[in-house]
Amino acid sequence: MMNTTCYRLVVCEKPSVARSIAAVLGAGRREDGFLSGGGYLVSWCFGHLAELSDADAYDEKFGKWRREDLPILPDSWQYTVARDKQKQMNTLRTLMHREDVCEVINACDAGREGELIFRTAYNLNNCRKRVKRLWISSMEDAAILQGFDNLRDGAEYDNLYASALCRSKADWLVGINATRLFSVMYHRTLNVGRVVSPTLALLVQREAEINAFQPESFYTVHLDFNGFSAAGERMKEQAEAERLAGDCNCKTAAVTSVVQTEKTEKAPALYDLTTLQRDANRLLGYTAQQTLDYLQSLYEKKLCTYPRTDSRYLTDDMEGGVNALALCCAGICGTEPPAAVCSGQVCSSKKVSDHHAVVPTMAAGETDLETLPAGEREILRLVSRQVLMAVSAPFVYLETEARLDCGGNAFAAKGKTILHMGWRAYTEKGKQDSTLPELSEGQSLPVSSCAVKEGKTTPPKHFTEDTLLSAMETAGKEDMPEDAERKGLGTPATRAAVIEKLVATGFAERRKAKKSVRLVPTEAGVSLITVLPEQLQSPLLTAEWEHRLKEIECGELGADEFLAGICDMVAALVRDAAPVDGAEVLFPSGRPVVGKCPRCGAEVTESKNGYFCERRSCKFGLWRDNRFLAAKKISLTKKMASSLLTQGRAYASGIYSEKTGKTYDAFIVLEDDGARSSYKLDFTK
């Protein structure tokens, strides 16, 4: 009798997620590389099981980096499976081709990268079975069950996969070609990336602005009254400010106007990943990568919703649960929920793309927070506090602006009276009044004291991870269409990795300041941006690429058209790139210096085959063993090369005579006509 059992194969992104899903599905039997039970086989990847192969997989000659081999533009793409992941790839292949597996469910992360991870494994294993997609924003049991009750057709995500594949290929094309090109041009490994390089350019530009800044002094006259003070306009000259202060001292000032305005500050929206990373850096000192790691762990523990989101709202159908969510968050924070929960202001399906905002799950409210690692606990509380603020009423205050006249000179004073704390009840900032006394137009006030205060203009601030993430998010925004769905450098899911790569490759470093940790470019980072052409460091161009990837995802742009544009750009880059003058100063070789070049004055350094000018546009060199030296059976030593460059000649002993077969001593003299160098012998002492 034939076996009619039909299994559904569930492929997850990592083992921990597979275990959670398997537990919900009743697949509790452990097998080699998968779990089974309840009609399901639940297996996993280890992130990317296979990635685009390196260039030498296409041709052995690409094993050496040569400019003449560029650009490298594969006609068909090859993949390499990491050795430590081959066994799991084989397991997936076996499972996908089992006759009793009738359907494959993609349960990798519900996003661009998760789609790529699954499709790569599916395609490389030549699987042709029907695919369903699990798309969930929470790892709670109820959310998983609901997701399996509402599986989507895998074909609905073909455009998402196309976008992910284009991103991967674009990164390869730019990274492989540009890294090889500039490494060969400047004789050292220079890692160039589609997103990494323009992000580094932001750091370098800011550093240049800070270094070029010249502080300027300014002076302000302050009048003190009973209970408040007023300030005049800024003045450039101290003497002028001192004269004004002298005129006002011990006089009276007249109130010329009093204007009161009621102002409202709306509650902030919920967190998306980038906004959470920014606040976690500013308030807790966490790096973007640390925040993502903590949030990912909370997600896998079913305590937070999906982390890699770019939305700050919930969907409309979630509005009914906002009151319970607020109560849960209040418990996590050890406080009270708002008196009136404004659930409508956090729900808007129109503003949610793939995933809603990051919020705690209801399970988080039932968890003993002390059992969590400190980092996860602080992030969970930060997310919970944001929910409480987001569902609160506005912050309302009365702003009073008084204008005064003293001796014909204008002064101003401002005060603020809080009318309703609203969402600011959950934050320390803005809780204090700064009120002015009751003032009326025409009122005369005695000046109790008068002082001149000096200030200085301040330079732009160094980037922190908070402000760099903001700059990455908004890069190119002003030059792109208002309706563009994705702007900026990278995505919420990739920005942390970009920052970490800059630090890991030595192009940027974290530098502690009094109240923050700055991100600054290293000398190597500044040098790299100095020699890179505009198209590789332009945030606008990279933001435009991100926008086009989003168009591919939405089915508005073809993948072939996008990649053709990338290939054209890479080919033009290889064709047109030329070394920057003075690059030898930016990228010193580190080789021993033997003297100065007689042609251009740059340093001559020792290398394997001789002694050559560091300036690459200059062709001067002294070979260790040219025809002349080989015939004399001598080799040019470092000491001899130094003597040739400083004195024009070098003493040599044991010179072989082809005529007599004997040896003799003489001076070797350097002759250089600006185009070629040669040697001759000199027997004078």
Provide a role label for each language-model segment.
Residues 1-165, 172, 459:
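Intrinsically disordered, low-complexity regulatory segments
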Residues 5-9, 31, 96, 124, ...:
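Basic, low-complexity terminal or inter-domain segments flanking catalytic cores
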Residues 6-9, 107-110, 187-189, 260-269, ...:
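Conserved short loop/turn motifs at secondary-structure junctions
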Residues 15-22, 39-42, 46, 82-93, ...:
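Amphipathic alpha-helical transducer elements in NTP-driven molecular machines
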Residues 101-104, 120-133, 190, 194, ...:
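Feature marking long nucleic-acid-engaging regions of large polymerase/nuclease enzymes
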Residues 143-225, 260-264:
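C-terminal or mid-to-C-terminal helical accessory/interaction module adjacent to the motor/catalytic core
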Residues 155, 238-271, 277:
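Metal- or metallocofactor-binding catalytic centers and their adjacent structured scaffolds
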